[in-house]
Amino acid sequence: MAATSGNGQEPMDTSSSLLDLEAYLTNYTGVTRARRLAFIASVSPPHKRDALALAAAEVKRTTNTALYLELVALSGDDGGLSRDDGWVEQVDRKAQQRLDKLESDLNGHKTSLVKESIRMGHTDLGDFHYERGDFNTALKCYVRTRDYCTTSKHIIAMCLNVIKASIQMGNFTHVTNYITKAESTPDGSDPTLLAQLRVAAGLAFLEAKKYKLAARKFLDVPPELGSSYSEVASAQDVALYGGLCALASFDRAELKAKLIDAPGFKTFLELYPQVREAAHDFFQSRYASCLAHLEKLRPDLLLDLHLHDHVKQLYDDVRSKALVQYFSPFVTVDMRLMATAFNVGVDGLEKELAKLIMDKQIAARIDSQAKVLHARHADQRTATFAAALKMGDEYMRDTKAMLLRINLMRADFIVKGEGQGIGPSKSSRQEARATAPFHPAGIDGLMAMEGP
């Protein structure tokens, strides 16, 4: 059974996913638990009923009635979720009372002009709206605390609050801006803080489809992250996002240095052994095994809140890289053997190779009759001579330009503004003639352009 991704574009086959929802939830805290379950329910019919039940139970521990009503609407007739109007009315009434108190307290703090109290008042209001699921209002409250921050710790707390609200909204421009602000504060070098900021930066680059930059951020996350950022992403997510983006974008040397042999990231890879095995298989040129590992992961990855829109592109990039890397050492390749190595049919492989050739990722031509791929290697000797001639021409041009400049300077020859004449004065000419100019025609030759 297939569903459609959150952006309505990518078909998502999640029927073979064996995701244990209750075990999955243990990796997260806060509002992201219910939001991830709601997303799973929206894209995976096989998981819809269980995900909705867990999400509704999770939401009822909070004051987020808006998300609860979304879950009820998503449930429809077959989701098994009925609307609890009594709970909604009770929570909304209590929430309004708390909101009135928070706003009253904030007004009192503004009257007293105590900056710390005003900052805390805005933060409490932001936390209230964040729990209610009104991330836009929460963001505005968090941003207002900026004018009342008196220490670097206050600035960092403000930045982290803005970042988490912006991530929930999908506003990654704000995320990037406030990451930079947090990193520039005096206390911005704390390992746990750096870990959280790098995770947020990785998510921003992932959303922008800048997979290489995303991989570098995720792979630079220190082990101190632990579960400190589970309201946004888990340590398992770091291993998954970082490993997959690295496989899709890193070259062989960078993959080994920054992923496979990186001592800091090994801690994360231990949490996701399938990604570790896929990376090792890719580096060891066991491409069929690597791609098989990734295919087993695909159904679960399509259920991920942040990764789902990128799975197809990332997988295509990994496969293209594998094909290019397999072919690169050879002059000719038997496509039948290559098809066996990639566990694919020859006709299908030929179409993939043709696309890579058209995209100029492989310099080769296909012999469809013999099923052989021939490399198109450039004539290195001709290329070397051409480069040498080009360098010589550039040297001659630069030398002539320098000689001309020297002669002009010796002649005191300048171009002045309109109406002020051209060239040096008579005395300057006489002085120039007393020197030994480089110009083969002499100074008079240079001055000939002046006229009498």
Protein language model annotation of sequence segments:
Residues M1-I155, L160, K164-P452:
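Charged, E/D/K/R/S-rich low-complexity terminal regions of large eukaryotic assembly subunits
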